[in-house]
Amino acid sequence: MDLASLRAQQIELASSVIREDRLDKDPPDLIAGADVGFEQGGEVTRAAMVLLKYPSLELVEYKVARIATTMPYIPGFLSFREYPALLAAWEMLSQKPDLVFVDGHGISHPRRLGVASHFGLMVDVPTIGVAKKRLCGKFEPLSSEPGALAPLMDKGEQLAWVWRSKARCNPLFIATGHRVSVDSALAWVQRCMKGYRLPEPTRWADAVASERPAFVRYTANQP
């Protein structure tokens, strides 16, 4: 594995990421959520993509793609491992969203190219990174109150907002993916909350990918 070449690709791709608002439709009609996991000891990459109506946040479509994993897990290069399955799930959708929430980092990455940025750039769709753990940068400690907020900074640059979406839960790291500003990324995530730690798009993507009870109940009620 030529990590020097992959690192150079990341730096080059990151230079093309658009960090300002360029939504084709604002407000969007459809928002997608995307989540990636692995099966069979990492040999299979599984990507779930869901479509929700906005502003009702009603689930209208979901797809799950499973493909052979083409790259081992290497910290800092996860997007190269996850992107092929995300693309496969994206191509399965019967209609394309105006905005995509990706479970993972956007520009809040050492080389400013997390999976949300990588995917958004490659398919040219506005994306937001919604990550559960910090990958780089520093932030001031948050209060325990829901709604507590702090910028994630690295080398004098704001990479994300660190936001405690729910009491007694760890904060989310909300970043520009592509074609969405960091402030708008936070605003869109806040508009898509329904009382859980995660916004509805990535909450549903996680539920579909992992066949969690919410998704099992949903499918049981479908005609």
Swiss-Prot record:
Primary localization: cytoplasm
| Compartment(s) | Cytoplasm
Where along the chain is Mg(2+) bound?
35, 103
At which residues is there a site annotated Interaction with target DNA? 73
- UniProt cofactor(s): Mg(2+)
Q: Does the keyword Mitochondrion apply?
A: no
Q: Which GO terms describe its cellular component?
A: cytoplasm
* EC number(s) per entry: 3.1.21.7
Which keywords are on file for this protein?
Cytoplasm, DNA damage, DNA repair, Endonuclease, Hydrolase, Magnesium, Metal-binding, Nuclease
GO biological process entries = DNA repair
Q: Per its UniProt record, what InterPro entries does this chain match? A: Endonuclease-V
> One MF term from GO for this chain?
single-stranded RNA binding
Q: Which reaction does it catalyse?
A: Endonucleolytic cleavage at apurinic or apyrimidinic sites to products with a 5'-phosphate
Q: In this UniProt entry, which cysteines form S-S bonds?
A: none
Entry coiled-coil feature ranges: none
The protein's job, in short, is: DNA repair enzyme involved in the repair of deaminated bases. Selectively cleaves double-stranded DNA at the second phosphodiester bond 3' to a deoxyinosine leaving behind the intact lesion on the nicked DNA.
Q: Mind telling me which PANTHER family this protein's record contains?
A: ENDONUCLEASE V
- State the similarity comment: Belongs to the endonuclease V family.
- Matching NCBIfam families, A to Z? PRK11617.1
The protein's name in its UniProt record = Endonuclease V
Native organism: Escherichia coli O139:H28 (strain E24377A / ETEC)
Q: Please state the gene responsible for encoding this protein.
A: nfi
